Amino acid sequence: MGRVKLEIKRIENTTNRQVTFSKRRNGLIKKAYELSILCDIDIALLMFSPSDRLSLFSGKTRIEDVFSRYINLSDQERENALVFPDQSRRPDFQSKEYLLRTLQQLKAENDIALQLTNPTAINSDVEELEHEVYKLQQQLLMAEEELRKYEPDPIRFTTMEEYETCEKQLMDTLTRVNQRREHILSQDQLSSYEASALQQQQSMGGPFGNDVVGGWLTENGPNEAHLFDASAHSAMYETLLQGSSSSSNQNNIMGESNVSNHNGDMFQEWAQAYNSTTAHNPSTLFPPMQHQHGLVVDPNIEEIEIPVMKKDAQADHEVSDYDIRMPQLSSQ
């Protein structure tokens, strides 16, 4: 019995459909290979399996080249090249339109690929970049040549002039480096001096110390003139009293104590009167002071005359007092 002829229609079973494709694919590829060898033709075979796996075959020419030849054909040639097993069957118009759109897309992609691979289609930006790279390479070579001057190779020198020139360049460079170093050191010292001066000025509270004096005197305060208290006045005038008493004792020829005691009583009365006056109204002696041009100025200052006896008048008074008291003492 012969083989049963398989009806040409779609196989419904998925497994059977995949098995049938695998068997007939190998036979189709074998026939295409034999045809390309025997007839020396360009052939391209493109297949997708039921599981969407791609299968390709091409002869001695790449499949891309075969498709390019097909894309470059005219529409009339493409239409005449369509071959159908059943001659009574006509091509579907919608399938033809879809195929044409696909072919036009492939042709556009092919044109882009040819334009990119064409040496004459180099972009101007690429030329500018190449020119910039060339310039940078030249600058790099020049910089390397300049650096070689600071690390000379004695083997390359052949004359004394070259040695002297190299020595002069190195000495000039060393001089510039030292000058730059001194400049930086001077700038650092100046900045440190300014910082210390500013810190000292801030610690003093002002350039002339006015803040220190201003701390003593409260502006418009009631006690701004009380620089010294009553005890300080008493101590000061007690010292003056002692000094006056000692000077009067030196001027006294007889050296008796009653004369010095008499003078002491006079000064004590005067000191007590002064202390009582300053205790009641101390501001009369030291009125409010003002600052003018960094100095302390008292606008109400007046000259005060202190009643101090001259030495000659004081001596005459003491002698007369002595003459009066001597008869009294002798009578006692």
Swiss-Prot record:
SMART domains assigned to the protein according to its UniProt record, in alphabetical order: MADS
Keywords: Coiled coil, DNA-binding, Nucleus, Transcription, Transcription regulation
GO molecular function, one term: protein dimerization activity
Highest taxon, organism lineage: Eukaryota
Organs and tissues of expression: Expressed in pollen.
Keyword Magnesium belongs to the record: no
Limits of the MADS-box domain: 1-61
SUPFAM superfamilies assigned to the protein according to its UniProt record, in alphabetical order: SRF-like
CDD domains for the chain: MADS_MEF2_like (cd00265)
Effect of gene knockout: No visible phenotype under normal growth conditions. Pollen grains from the double mutant agl66 and agl104 have severely reduced viability, delayed germination and aberrant pollen tube growth.
InterPro entries attached to this UniProt entry: MADS-box/MEF2_TF (IPR050142), MEF2-like_N (IPR033896), TF_MADSbox (IPR002100), TF_MADSbox_sf (IPR036879)
Purpose of the protein: Probable transcription factor that forms a heterodimer with the MADS-box protein AGL30 and is involved in the regulation of pollen maturation at the late stages of pollen development and pollen tube growth.
Protein name listed in UniProt: Agamous-like MADS-box protein AGL66
